[in-house]
Structures are given as C-alpha cells and as structure tokens.
C-alpha cells in the first residue's frame, strides 16, 4: 500500500503528516516505527494524522504517534503543522479550527503573518491527573508551585508535574546547554512515579520574559523543540515566581511565544509551521 505524506516541522520538531480522511491508515506499531526511522523510512519525531471528527462541535480529529510507535495524547508543535496542513490542502477555509485530541479539544488559529496560535487549554496541576504518584517523595514549595524530589544519577531533581493534555516534569536548571539532559532525561521519562512515562523538561530562566528549554520527549528522545513542553515549562516558571507572561522560549529549533494568565486560564502558544516536502511511500518497502 502506498501513502501520500507531507513532511513538516514546527521549530525543528519534525513530523510526517498524513491525511486519514482520503486514504486508509491502518499501520502496525512496527510500521509507525519504520516510517519514523531516519535511515529506513521518511524520518520524524512524530507522525500526525488528520481524521474526521467523532463529535459535531469540532472540525477535525488529530492523532499523534511517537517515533517508537506509541500513540500519545498531544503535540503542540504538531498542532501548528496540523492547521497549516488542512489549510494548504483545502480541507478547510477557516482561519481558526477546533480539533479534538485524545483528552479534549484545542483551537488552532492561522495568523496573517503565517505564524500559528494554539489555545492549549488550561494546565492540569493535580498530580493524579498528570498522572503522577508522589507518595513518599520530598516536597518543596516555591511561590504557588509544589516541586517533588526525584533521585536521579545521585542528585535530587526537583520537578514540577504539569499536564498539557500530556504529562510533563519540569526541572529548573542554571545552565541548560551544559546540563546532562541525555543522561537524566531517560531516567525521568521512565521514573516509577509516572505510570504513563513523562516528557522531561529542563528550563533555564534568562529573565522574567525569556527562557531556554530542552525537552527529552517520551518515546522520541530529545527533540529540537516541544510545544507542550514549552507551555508546561512556562506554567511551572510562572507558578514558581520566576517568569511573567508572555514568555519567549528559546529552543534549539527556534523560538516559541507562550502566554498564560494563571489559574484556569488557557495557555496560548504561538510559533511557526513549515512545510518541507511532499511524497509517496510504499509501506511494503519498510522493514517489518
């Protein structure tokens, strides 16, 4: 079976985007992995699927598969590429669309300058809903934030659990470029306190409106940018009293602008969405 695809990226976080409305998509976990392979497939951090909605109050359904073949709840950078894709393909003439994801609905708006703003909804901070199981962990309060101590590589990592529709553990560090992200990231991702694994974010505060961020993504490893990770990091930074909205987040792949007014207000993310190329791939050519 041959599939039409579009290769896109949002601040360097790269995706294979597939139209699941006009072509049948029934891939195995192994096929998703092969499609994401940078040696044997197209290569991507995640695969994004456009589907018909399952409810009447939204325009599309948005599904995400990680490079390891697992389906996940959300991807913020992918959401920006999603609305660019459906607009460029003539699947909608709206500048703003409502999209269902695994755990809710998000609103995506294409701006006149080509940037995309995503209404990510309110952050979820209740540990059980992240989900996070902190029983027995040391606790430290800073501002409105409650951080929990994980023993990682012989050090205590003080993490703030935040869900942006997917789970994040945010750690504030002094020098993110020289921090051992590749060593600590997998240990946090697979820590027993996160039953569904977790995206590990490493946040450096530059000033009250500027931050640097690296994210070790669940099922993908470190990526050049992570939209939900940037949102979670800003939420944690604001709650700790270290940041004020709006915040420009510098990632290795580019800048994301994050705004949050606190409490139950939605987090708003603005950033780029770029089409790289289009193509056709024969699933029979992928390794089994």
Curated annotation (Swiss-Prot):
Its EC number is 5.1.1.7. The active site is at residues 75, 226. Keywords: Amino-acid biosynthesis, Cytoplasm, Isomerase, Lysine biosynthesis. It catalyses: (2S,6S)-2,6-diaminopimelate = meso-2,6-diaminopimelate. Its main location: cytoplasm. Pathway: Amino-acid biosynthesis; L-lysine biosynthesis via DAP pathway; DL-2,6-diaminopimelate from LL-2,6-diaminopimelate: step 1/1. It is found in: Cytoplasm. GO terms for biological process: lysine biosynthetic process via diaminopimelate. GO terms for cellular component: cytosol. Substrate binds at residues 13, 46, 66, 76-77, 166, 199, 217-218, 227-228. GO terms for molecular function: diaminopimelate epimerase activity. The keyword Transmembrane does not apply. Gene3D superfamilies: Diaminopimelate Epimerase, Chain A, domain 1. SUPFAM superfamilies: Diaminopimelate epimerase-like. InterPro entries: DAP_epimerase_AS, DAP_epimerase_DapF. The record marks 168, 217 as: Could be important to modulate the pK values of the two catalytic cysteine residues. It comes from the Bacteria. NCBIfam families: DapF. Belongs to the diaminopimelate epimerase family. Homodimer. Catalyzes the stereoinversion of LL-2,6-diaminopimelate (L,L-DAP) to meso-diaminopimelate (meso-DAP), a precursor of L-lysine and an essential component of the bacterial peptidoglycan. This is Diaminopimelate epimerase. It comes from Cupriavidus pinatubonensis (strain JMP 134 / LMG 1197).
């Amino acid at each position: 079976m041959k599939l039409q695809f579009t290769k896109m990226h949002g601040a360097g976080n790269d995706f294979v985007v597939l139209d699941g409305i006009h072509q049948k998509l029934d891939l195995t976990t192994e096929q998703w992995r092969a499609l994401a392979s940078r040696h044997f497939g197209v290569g991507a951090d995640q695969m994004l699927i456009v589907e018909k909605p399952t409810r009447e109050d939204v325009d599309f359904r948005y599904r995400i598969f990680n490079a390891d073949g697992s389906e996940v709840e959300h991807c913020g950078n992918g959401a920006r590429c999603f609305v660019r894709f459906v607009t460029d393909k003539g699947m909608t003439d709206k500048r703003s669309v409502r999209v269902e994801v695994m755990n809710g609905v998000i609103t995506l708006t294409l701006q006149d300058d080509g940037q995309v703003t995503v209404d990510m909804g309110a952050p979820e901070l209740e540990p059980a809903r992240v989900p996070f199981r902190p029983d027995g962990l040391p606790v430290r309060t800073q501002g409105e934030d409650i951080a929990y101590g994980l023993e990682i590589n012989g050090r205590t990592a003080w993490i703030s659990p935040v869900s942006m529709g997917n789970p994040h553990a945010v750690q504030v560090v002094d020098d993110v470029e020289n921090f051992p992200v590749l060593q600590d990231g997998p240990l946090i991702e697979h820590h027993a306190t996160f039953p569904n694994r977790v995206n590990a974010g490493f946040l450096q505060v530059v000033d009250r409106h500027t931050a640097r961020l690296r994210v070790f993504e669940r099922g993908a490893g470190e990526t050049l940018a992570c939209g939900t990770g940037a949102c979670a990091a800003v939420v944690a930074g604001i709650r700790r009293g270290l940041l004020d909205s709006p915040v420009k987040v510098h990632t290795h792949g580019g800048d994301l602008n994050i705004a949050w007014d606190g409490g139950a207000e939605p987090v708003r993310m603005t950033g780029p969405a770029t089409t790289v190329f289009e193509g056709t791939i024969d699933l029979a050519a992928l390794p089994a």
